[in-house]
């Protein structure tokens, strides 16, 4: 009879989890929010990073909401027309990003943009993949802006509140 150590079982479980994620992410694209075209890995990664860094402490519905806002911006003529450009939109001076002058604060806060919590990161990848490959109802009501409920940005005074989800307030 074989005996497996707890460490060996844990490593095997992590390997299987990575493998399943890889299979899931590489599945054929289905019609959905991605306008029925294949989604590139960069778009998936950019959307997942935005979900991870903007909403990793939220319930799953709040994480989906952040992803939906990102996609709503891609569809809006006032924003760039691809996911990565929306996520990394920032003010630059001499080709350098100005700290705290970007659309999503995690990108220009001076901290690492590498996800540390792998379990939460894989959850963000799955949410991003679902949003890009399936028709997910936009329960944010078309929101293009949001902020955490513990701050009141200047821009929010001129926006109409559409919905509150978790720790975020969403605007048109």
Stretch-by-stretch model annotation:
Residues 1-9:
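Short, Lys/Arg-rich N-terminal segment immediately upstream of the first membrane anchor
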Residues 13-26:
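Hydrophobic membrane-insertion alpha-helices, especially the h-region
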Residues 30-172:
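Bacterial extracytoplasmic/cell-wall-associated proteins, especially those involved in peptidoglycan
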């Amino acid at each position: 009879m074989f005996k497996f150590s707890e460490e060996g079982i844990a490593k095997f479980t992590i390997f299987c989890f990575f493998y399943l994620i890889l299979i899931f992410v590489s599945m054929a694209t289905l019609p959905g929010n991605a306008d029925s075209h294949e989604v590139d890995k960069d778009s998936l990664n950019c959307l997942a990073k935005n979900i991870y860094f903007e909403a990793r402490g939220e319930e799953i519905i709040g994480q989906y909401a952040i992803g939906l806002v990102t996609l709503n911006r891609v569809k809006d003529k006032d924003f760039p027309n691809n996911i990565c450009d929306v996520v990394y939109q920032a003010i630059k001076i001499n080709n350098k990003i100005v700290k705290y002058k970007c659309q999503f604060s995690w990108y220009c806060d001076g901290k690492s943009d590498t996800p540390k919590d792998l379990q939460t990161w894989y959850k963000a990848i799955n949410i991003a993949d679902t949003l890009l490959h399936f028709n997910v109802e936009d329960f944010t009501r078309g929101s293009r802006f949001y902020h955490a409920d513990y701050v009141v940005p200047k821009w929010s005074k001129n926006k109409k509140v559409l919905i509150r989800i978790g720790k975020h307030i969403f605007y048109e």
